[in-house]
């Protein structure tokens, strides 16, 4: 198995990028760049990371939920308000990021007046 892989842009020959609707995600479009179904992380030796981009309309959100994966959310455009269950909301603007361990219940909402584009990186628990 190779130690690296090139991912072609969606629509280009050989691309495995796909768009999907995720449970608990509202008024948004998620695109998975790398994962088990989309050509990674198991397509490279030792690969584990999952990565995608989500576009949120104004008011778009993610309901409170948790997963076992370490998560990093990076705001590319617009703004998002992230909240850890029981905690205070934190406004993230373009260039800001949010990093949490697995098992944390969190929510997100685009509180701005324009769309938000967010890079999402997930690392499943290690065996």
Region spans (language model):
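Short acidic-glycine-tyrosine-enriched beta hairpin
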Residues: 86-102
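A generic "binding-loop/recognition-motif" signal
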Residues: 68, 88, 104-105, 114
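A generic structural signal for short beta-strands and their flanking turns/coil linkers
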Residues: 29, 47-52, 71, 78, ...
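Conserved short histidine dyad/triad with adjacent acidic residue
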Residues: 32-40, 50-67, 102-103
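Short, conserved beta-strand element in jelly-roll/cupin
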Residues: 53-57, 67-82, 121
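A short hydrophobic beta-strand segment most commonly corresponding to one strand
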Residues: 54, 72, 99, 113-127
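A short, N-terminal "cap"/entry segment at the start of jelly-roll beta-barrel domains
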Residues: 1-48
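Short beta-strand His + acidic residue motifs that chelate non-heme Fe in jelly-roll/DSBH
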Residues: 62-64, 82-83, 100, 106-113
